[in-house]
């Protein structure tokens, strides 16, 4: 057996066992690596003023405040809402909702019976039990999320500290020319920077838009604005987690016009205008004006890759989806610019 074949057999065996050993941490390591790549320009900026250790720590500290503090805020506010529920008021609200729905559906016999049977099991006791189950699930999920976040932050410090060494090492190890490897890396890093900044600005815009509106109806605009901005990152439901309960609350108190306005404002202005219209425009602006990058990836493709990533990977899909897309497109360009052209030159000769 040739030494080269023997080496690759040993390498594949070792690689398999490495994956098996660290399989529970692969996603955390991937997220930490992608965040490091996307934010490494911040690290380079801080390196001009601080030592490598301090600049790495500052980068991790900023990310920790962005990830852990909002999570604590959500858990704290959510637990307060659940444990401060007034059972009598909740029963009255449910009774009113059931009566209103049944009365309005009396003109539609085809669906009236089915909805009435469903509402028979709809009571304050069942909702309270469901909320307790949800709070228990949120508690377990939050604990796992905090554990993952702490592990990611630990890996981030490691990646930030040794980032330049890792970069040079991987460029040298890859079986490609140096400029080819750099182009792939620059493509992925550029997309990550655009996605991270776009997501941050979108969260702020949606939170400010909702908080500014809701304060006029006597609610806590600061807290609900933060919650809405964070809820907008939740796949599928997004800000509906916030505006639906508030609209129901306004309906219960007889504020029909206010409830309709909250629903339309949340769906049309925030859901359609900001999330579906302004967000793609933001991607174009950030790409061409802020980073002034020469990336040849369509902005709409970046937008849809974020949506696809969220649907497949959940919260972290915001960065995983665009990364996969950018990496694949970079490989296609590499194949087009180097391998196809090389074959054409060979044929001409």
From Swiss-Prot:
<feature type="transmembrane region" description="Helical">
    <location>
        <begin position="143"/>
        <end position="163"/>
    </location>
</feature>
<keyword id="KW-0813">Transport</keyword>
<dbReference type="GO" id="GO:0005886">
    <property type="term" value="C:plasma membrane"/>
</dbReference>
<keyword id="KW-1003">Cell membrane</keyword>
<dbReference type="InterPro" id="IPR002549">
    <property type="entry name" value="AI-2E-like"/>
</dbReference>
<keyword id="KW-1133">Transmembrane helix</keyword>
<keyword id="KW-0812">Transmembrane</keyword>
<feature type="transmembrane region" description="Helical">
    <location>
        <begin position="224"/>
        <end position="244"/>
    </location>
</feature>
<feature type="transmembrane region" description="Helical">
    <location>
        <begin position="300"/>
        <end position="320"/>
    </location>
</feature>
<feature type="transmembrane region" description="Helical">
    <location>
        <begin position="195"/>
        <end position="215"/>
    </location>
</feature>
<keyword id="KW-0472">Membrane</keyword>
<feature type="transmembrane region" description="Helical">
    <location>
        <begin position="56"/>
        <end position="76"/>
    </location>
</feature>
<feature type="transmembrane region" description="Helical">
    <location>
        <begin position="6"/>
        <end position="26"/>
    </location>
</feature>
<feature type="transmembrane region" description="Helical">
    <location>
        <begin position="27"/>
        <end position="47"/>
    </location>
</feature>
<comment type="similarity">
    <text>Belongs to the autoinducer-2 exporter (AI-2E) (TC 2.A.86) family.</text>
</comment>
<protein>
    <recommendedName>
        <fullName>Putative transport protein jhp_0514</fullName>
    </recommendedName>
</protein>
<feature type="transmembrane region" description="Helical">
    <location>
        <begin position="258"/>
        <end position="278"/>
    </location>
</feature>
<dbReference type="Pfam" id="PF01594">
    <property type="entry name" value="AI-2E_transport"/>
</dbReference>
